[in-house]
Structures are given as C-alpha cells and as structure tokens.
C-alpha cells in the first residue's frame, strides 16, 4: 500500500471540502466536524467534481445535481449500492497521510 503525505494546504478547514492532486489524480478531502476524510473526486451520477461541493447536514453535496454522500463511507441514499470509493487517512503527529488504495 502506498501512503502519500499531504501538505497543510491540502487540508480543508472545518466544515469545508477541497480538491487536491495526489499521485497525478484529483481527490476530494473533507473536514467533517474536525475529522478528515478522503474520497474519489468524481460523482458516480454524472461525473461532477465532489471537491467543489458543499457539506450540508453531515453529507457532501455534489455541485452539479445535488447527490449527497456520506464522507465517512462514500455511500449515497439516492440509489442503493452506489458509493464513491474512499481512501484511508492516517495522522502521525502533525502529518496527514493518504493511503492511495481505494476502500
């Protein structure tokens, strides 16, 4: 498994979502109530950029058509069995690492 260290600029503020390049691809990083989560940046509905979405009531909302995803699991309530792949984040001291193997 390959871990990549994220820089402080790669980490969103509490309640925010950002896109970051990791290993040549865009990843969505979410700060939900002070906890960090990472997932693919592509919405499975129409390919919207999830890292440009918003957090509403604990869900990540796609900016294109409003599909909502749980940042912890990648699951949506819109369609059974549909989810966005997530990535594990590990905190070691002041450093945050992303595991680039999809969960």
Where are these regions (language model features)?
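Short, basic/low-complexity N-terminal boundary segments at the transition from targeting/disordered tails
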Residues: 1-7, 64-75
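N-terminal pre-ligand scaffold of iron-sulfur
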Residues: 1-57, 86-103
